[in-house]
Amino acid sequence: VEWTDAERTAILTLWKKINIDEIGPCAMRRLLIVSPWTQRHFSTFGNISTNAAIMDNDLVAKHGSTVMGGLDRAIKNMDDIKGAYRELSKKHSDQLHVDPDNFRLLAECITLCVAGKFGPKEFTADVHEAWYKFLAAVTSALSRQYH
């Protein structure tokens, strides 16, 4: 992926403002509620059978924070996101058998939570465009090892 200076600045500036322990749980909860078929990958999380259970589940929140923390790898490797996620992609493909479309769904949830947090004055159309490109690069990298 090639980044313009404006895109790189928008992504890095936004990333510095993101609280992973707020956005991550928000996005993970939204994913499990809006796309309930994704719940099958989280059977070890205990009760996630209702929206209220998902909202109150500490393991859901913790995993959301972990996922958002994992985006830091892409931030630090913006010029080689595919390389940075090679092993994680392989794990999700070969061991966890995650449908790669779920990465896109989670990216949408992350974007919604970020937009809701920062609003249109900070999450402008230009910032949204750069953020979308960034998450598209991450989802592509995570999907790369699938056969």
UniProtKB/Swiss-Prot annotation:
Heme b binds at H63, H92. Pfam families: Globin. Red blood cells. GO terms for biological process: hydrogen peroxide catabolic process. Residues 2-147 form the Globin domain. Keywords: Heme, Iron, Metal-binding, Oxygen transport, Transport. It comes from the Eukaryota. One of its GO terms (cellular component) is blood microparticle. Involved in oxygen transport from gills to the various peripheral tissues. Heterotetramer of two alpha chains and two beta chains. Belongs to the globin family. This is Hemoglobin subunit beta-3.
